[in-house]
């Protein structure tokens, strides 16, 4: 399902963007092509292959947390879309959604410190995406875990050093992501 980009999370993010745009602008010129692309990718067979890949040897940390967070964001977008085809896609995506959420739930209790980089591994940005999904799905356990970890990691933070951002490799602001979360 998620191929054709430099990395897996970019493909997932691209699918989220297609869903968001097609849901937000159903009569736009691009909507039919976006829906066709989603229909090609979000099949039960394709998603089963993705789940199998994730469960492969040596992939326990695959796309954690950034890619898994975007996967959950895609699932939330499909759930928010009042459309029969989107409901089919959400159902097809469900096994990968469950696998992604379970991986986050298993990982976070072991993570003693936040990851404050301006890159994919950053926790605050991923937490924001995961929180949105948890709120949309009513996953109280995930909300509680994120709330606990967020308070543990960030509650005492003051005066984030914005003058040092961005660094030479950042594409996310650790300070702004933390404030957003």
What is the meaning of each model-derived region?
Residues 100-176:
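Loop-centered beta-sheet repeat module
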Residues 4, 10-12, 19-134:
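Extended ligand-binding groove/face enriched in aromatic
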């Amino acid at each position: 399902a998620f191929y054709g980009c430099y990395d897996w999370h970019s493909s997932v993010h691209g699918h989220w963007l297609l869903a968001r745009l097609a849901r937000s602008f159903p009569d736009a010129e691009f909507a039919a092509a976006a829906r066709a692309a989603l229909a090609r990718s979000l099949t039960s067979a394709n998603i089963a292959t993705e789940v199998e890949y994730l469960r492969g040897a040596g992939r326990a940390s695959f796309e954690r947390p950034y890619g898994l967070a975007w996967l959950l964001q895609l699932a939330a977008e499909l759930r928010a879309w009042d459309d029969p085809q989107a409901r089919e896609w959400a159902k097809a995506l469900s096994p990968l959604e469950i696998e992604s959420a379970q991986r986050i739930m298993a990982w976070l209790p072991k993570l003693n410190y936040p990851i404050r980089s301006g890159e994919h591994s950053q926790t605050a940005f991923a937490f924001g995406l995961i929180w949105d999904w948890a709120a949309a799905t009513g996953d109280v356990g995930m909300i509680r875990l994120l709330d606990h970890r967020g308070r543990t990691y960030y509650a005492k933070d003051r005066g984030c050093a914005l003058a040092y951002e961005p660094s030479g490799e950042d594409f996310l602001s650790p300070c702004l992501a933390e404030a957003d979360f």
